[in-house]
């Protein structure tokens, strides 16, 4: 049984306050995009092992036990005594890009196990399991445009469709640590919530919807800022960094026919949103 975990982009990201536990509260809008990994599971005949992880595509660092798809399997295996499985993961979503690739893989693994082994878990229960694995994992259970607050784990639906818009996503060959991204952040409450801004026409977003991480990331990694500028120079009506980086995306008008774009030494994904 196979499934295709998809990435997300952040539309706006406001860091609103630092919490007593050291984390930060924020508000953002998660929007699913059709950049996908591939994830398949089959029954493992060798019952001496609980799982075997087969990885291909983009390189993933770390031991198999640290991979979120494995953690998702072990979470439900412990609860429901699942049989051993072969896990095949093909990575197309870049890691460390602010695209939620690992979280998507984990959430889709929960959904895949639920279907394959007839666990009859409702979405709400799957979201509870997903939240154990990561703050934004639960978003990928329903996988619809969502306003997120808290530490990115409190969700409410957003009535938003970008159907027809052209998306160009670029990830340079740099890694942004979360610590670096937070290093220059001054938490603040914006004058207008993203819940309000997201209802405005996309053509107005450039001047009112921002990613707070850009203030600290751009000075440290100028190549990321240059990509954003280049997307605007090529005609994007809105461009921003996703999450804490290092990917940047541009939205182009449905009426504009754009050609294949190339960015030197960078991963580039281009599609029409459905």
Curated annotation (Swiss-Prot):
Stored InterPro entries: GHMP_kinase_C_dom (IPR013750), GHMP_kinase_C_sf (IPR036554), GHMP_kinase_N_dom (IPR006204), IspE (IPR004424), Ribosomal_Su5_D2-typ_SF (IPR020568), Ribsml_uS5_D2-typ_fold_subgr (IPR014721)
Pfam families for this protein: GHMP_kinases_C, GHMP_kinases_N
This protein's record includes keyword Mitochondrion: no
Pathway it works in: Isoprenoid biosynthesis; isopentenyl diphosphate biosynthesis via DXP pathway; isopentenyl diphosphate from 1-deoxy-D-xylulose 5-phosphate: step 3/6
Record's catalysed reaction(s): 4-CDP-2-C-methyl-D-erythritol + ATP = 4-CDP-2-C-methyl-D-erythritol 2-phosphate + ADP + H(+)
GO terms classed as biological process: isopentenyl diphosphate biosynthetic process, methylerythritol 4-phosphate pathway; terpenoid biosynthetic process
Taxonomy, superkingdom: Bacteria
Coiled coil: none
Keywords: ATP-binding, Isoprene biosynthesis, Kinase, Nucleotide-binding, Transferase
Top EC category: transferase
Keyword Kinase carried by entry: yes
GO molecular function, one term: ATP binding
Binding locations of ATP: 94-104
Residues at the active site: 8, 136
Enzyme Commission identifier(s): 2.7.1.148
PANTHER family: 4-DIPHOSPHOCYTIDYL-2-C-METHYL-D-ERYTHRITOL KINASE, CHLOROPLASTIC
Role noted for this protein: Catalyzes the phosphorylation of the position 2 hydroxy group of 4-diphosphocytidyl-2C-methyl-D-erythritol.
Family, per entry: Belongs to the GHMP kinase family. IspE subfamily.
Protein name per its UniProtKB record: 4-diphosphocytidyl-2-C-methyl-D-erythritol kinase
Organism whose genome encodes this protein: Bacteroides fragilis (strain YCH46)
Protein encoded by which gene: ispE
